[in-house]
Amino acid sequence: MDHLKMELRHWVLSEAKELTNLCNAVDRHYLSDRLPNPYTEKDAEEWLKMVSDNDTITGIYRAIVCDGKLIGSISVEKKDDDAEIGYMLHNDYSNKGIGTEAVKQICPIAFKVLSLEQITANVFQPNIASIRVLLKNGFKYKGTIPNAVIKDGNVYDLLIYVLTKETR
């Protein structure tokens, strides 16, 4: 991470404008279509309210901040005894070890607070950077769902990675 100081922190309801700017600045090529495009301030306000109401109940939701600036988002959302991790970073902060560090910090919190057995990551096949982040954090390749995702006219395999409570 060189000299950058990265931290995960709770979201603040007043950050709708910053969140809107972030969501409209990230590379969406490999992001889920759950994120509206374009992302509006109303979308941000609704999401921040959901996070405020549900943090530590249905998931762990954190802002990724670097040197005091909002640069990304990371969450682990519960689904029964499993949960799915998702993250995004502003393009200017990619390939600096920040994603790896954010995943490293959030997983122990999620296992403890949400009483999880495992955390799953679903990755579009060409997203090598995300695969590297997961492998560096102990996630193991579990399988492939062929032709599972259509995004911007492209068809991608969906790769599944898992981190269990025992193997972390």
List each language-model region with its residue ranges:
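A generic local structural motif
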Residues: 48-50, 147-148
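A short, aromatic/hydrophobic, helix- or strand-capping loop or linear motif
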Residues: 31-37, 58-65
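Conserved GNAT-fold acetyl-CoA-binding loop/helix
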Residues: 28-49
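Acyl-donor (CoA/ACP) binding surface of acyl/acetyltransferases
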Residues: 1-29, 63-168
